[in-house]
C-alpha cells in the first residue's frame, strides 16, 4: 500500500510536496513527476521516497497547433505508465499539487478509481486543478471557505523564526531564485534613501543577476547582502522587518508564517494573474500592500517605512495556521488505511 505524490514543474508546487512528505515518515511514498521543470532536481535522490519516476511530459495550455497535439500524446503515454505504477504499488491515494507534471498521474488516478486529493496553491485556480476538481475526493485551498483544510503547508522553520516587527532596521527584496528585474531596479533606486536611514539591505537578485547587482551597489557606495538561490531563506526572513517580494503562493505564505509585513509586486505575466489574487487575499484583510509592476512609485514605497508594522505583523500571526502540512498528511494517511 502506498501514497503517490505528483506534480511540480516549479518550486512553488514542489515546496508543498516537500512540506507534506516530511509529515509522512514511515509511509511508502512514490513520487511521479516530469523530466521537464525542476522535479528531478528536487526529488530524484530524495530518500524519503521509495521510488521516483520522471516522465517525458510538458505543458499543454501554452502550446498551439501540432505542439498541443504532441503534448497531449506525451501525456497519454505517461498516463498509461502511471496507471501501471498505481497498480504495481497498490496505490491507496494520489496527492496532486497541480502543474503540468501532475496531469498524467492525476488522470490515471481518476481512470483507476484511486482517490485523488488535490492541493491548489493559488487564489486563481490552475487549469488542470479546475478541470479535475469535480472528480477529487478532496480539494484543498487556503483561499476557499469550503476547503476541508485551510492551513497552507509551510515548513516548520518559518514558524520557528516568527517575531513581531515594529520598526524597519532591515529590508529584504525577494525576486525569487531567478530574480525580478522590476524589484532589482526598485531596490537600487531607493537604496541611497535606505542608507540615509541606516537600514540594512538583503537582496535576492537572482542567480544570473548576482554579479551585476553587486556591482551596482558598489558603484553607489552601498553595502548589501546579495544572493540568488539559498537554503537560508527562512533565516533571511527572520532578520528582515519589511519585505518587497513577488507573490508566488509559497513565498507569500512563508512570509506570512514569519509575520513579516510585505509589499507585493506580482509577476505581471503569471497565468490567470494568480500572483495578484494571491496578494489581494492578504491586502483585503489589511495585512499587506500591493503595487502593480507598471505602477511602482518610489515615494509610496519609502512611505511604507513609517507605516504601522506591528498591527500587520500581529495580524499575520493570527491568520496563519501552523500545522497545514500535518493536516494534509493525516488526511492522506486516512485514505491509505481505508
Curated annotation (Swiss-Prot):
It holds the Pfam family Glyco_tran_28_C. It is an enzyme of class 2 (transferase). It is a peripheral membrane protein. GO terms for cellular component: plasma membrane. UDP-N-acetyl-alpha-D-glucosamine binds at residues 10-12, 122, 177, 275. It is found in: Cell inner membrane. GO terms for molecular function: UDP-N-acetyl-D-glucosamine:N-acetylmuramoyl-L-alanyl-D-glutamyl-meso-2,6-diaminopimelyl-D-alanyl-D-alanine-diphosphoundecaprenol 4-beta-N-acetylglucosaminlytransferase activity; undecaprenyldiphospho-muramoylpentapeptide beta-N-acetylglucosaminyltransferase activity. Belongs to the glycosyltransferase 28 family. MurG subfamily. This is UDP-N-acetylglucosamine--N-acetylmuramyl-(pentapeptide) pyrophosphoryl-undecaprenol N-acetylglucosamine transferase. It comes from Sulfurovum sp. (strain NBC37-1). The lineage of its organism: Bacteria, Pseudomonadati, Campylobacterota, Epsilonproteobacteria, Campylobacterales. The gene is murG.
